[in-house]
């Protein structure tokens, strides 16, 4: 009887967590099924039909989608996978916290309903898939972090696989990945010396992984996504330095546009597909056929060397807009029929849009807010770095901070989704840190 009284509350808490996670998954289906297709997702799905793989979007996402697609052809297959990973993550976290208190356990699936996290689960972007992949990796490691033996080793192997898979989805995460990997390898406590020791070798390993999988195993076509960053930088440097840094000559009207009118610290699309400045990429790509060649790389290197202050001004302007601006959040357009409303006659989705529209002007939907929250959590967790709870928070929030900051150098658009990993890392860390540290089990 004594044993039953001690274990019954924990069992009830775990059952409640499972029910809440299942209910959350069901709510996700009611609101979003069969998933919100974006233009990025549409391009990836079209590559499946064409049997082509490119590196502009992640070829690994194309392969993954092609594998799960027979289960529910179209957007539904990848949507169901993302939603399942999301609720599995928060369900596992709550299940693991049930031995501490029912309140902490239940708070995990409840916090999963926070608008900046939940509102993106049904939107098919690789940034969302990346976020839930890393979230699941960290939580799988956390669940077994107070144990020793084969179960923990298996959990760590799964978590490291998911960490690497996330890098393959978002290669700019390879600088942040070593922090998450260090947590997965040593989940019981965080030691900065160990993390520093593996940092550079881990970057090299993850970089090699991308090269091997993308171009060796999958044979992806090189579409030169890095040069989109360089084109954006050349436009920014030209604007701030008031000198044309593109490797082409413009006529007087084009020169005026490039130096004074085209540039906005929001996105590189202004030089690619938006009037009146899409002539820039048309000239570089179709006209002079320079895009994808060393001419762009050399022009970029010269521009940065000649005008480092202009480069920093451009990048700082972009980063400020990314962190503080009212940027694109959830996707609500119907990409198949742009003139039609997405999910007409669905009250649940309409209610979600209404809540989103009311909250969008608030700090909840600012990337900078979640960067600051991640920093605050990491500072708070530092004094508990010798515990599994502190190690978890430092691992996820530390990697989120570095990941968001990479956009200072590589960002070409300001969408809120690029900070989605920081949202998930922060939300997951809250219930972990709220209670007292747990004792280590054998």
Model-assigned labels for residue ranges:
Residues 72-77, 311-397:
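Membrane-interface anchor segments at the N-terminal boundary of transmembrane helices
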Residues 31-44, 52-64, 68, 73-76, ...:
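Extracytoplasmic catalytic/substrate-binding loops of multi-pass membrane glycan-assembly enzymes
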Residues 26, 155-170, 181-184, 199-206:
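Membrane-interface alpha helices of multi-pass inner-membrane proteins
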Residues 92, 131-148, 159-163, 179-180, ...:
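Specific aromatic-rich, kink-prone transmembrane helix
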Residues 12-16, 93-115, 131-132, 150-153:
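Transmembrane-helix signature of polytopic, membrane-embedded enzymes
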Residues 30, 59-62, 66, 71-75, ...:
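Aromatic- and kink-enriched transmembrane "portal" helix at the membrane-lumen/periplasm boundary
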Residues 219-342:
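Membrane-proximal stem/loop segments at transmembrane-domain junctions that anchor or position
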Residues 80-100, 136:
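Transmembrane-helix motifs of polytopic, lipid-linked glycan transferases
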